Design a protein with these regions (language model features):
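Signature of N-terminal electron-transfer/Fe-S-associated modules in redox systems
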Residues: 1-104
């Protein structure tokens, strides 16, 4: 079962963030709030000891990690994370088949 997949663009951006901020991982968690009941909470990890047992770890091609909190896993099954650049900016885009609705 695949919890989450990263596009090559998302993987490249995770590598860039980790290098620029001297961290080992970018994290994604869900927390209560937002217009659909949940909102995505992004973060970084600088020490491997901060990764909890049961967290989902996806290694990038440069040895950095994308970590999903064990508490968020069941809500993110089948999710694809992309990094999109446009004229108005750039951001991670989450395609979550489990989301009932989205903001905006």
């Amino acid at each position: 079962m695949t919890i989450c997949t990263l596009t090559s663009s998302a993987e490249q951006q995770i590598n860039t963030i980790c290098k620029e901020h001297n961290v080992i991982a970018v994290t994604l968690n869900l927390k209560g709030g937002g217009c659909a009941g949940f909102e995505y909470d992004w973060g970084t990890i600088s020490d491997a000891q901060d990764i909890e047992e049961g967290d989902e770890i996806i290694a990038t091609n440069e040895g950095f990690n994308f970590v999903i909190s064990k508490h968020s896993l069941m809500f993110l099954i089948g999710t694809e994370v992309d990094y999109v650049k446009s004229l108005v900016g750039s951001n991670f885009e989450i395609r979550n088949p489990n989301a009932q609705s989205s903001c905006g």
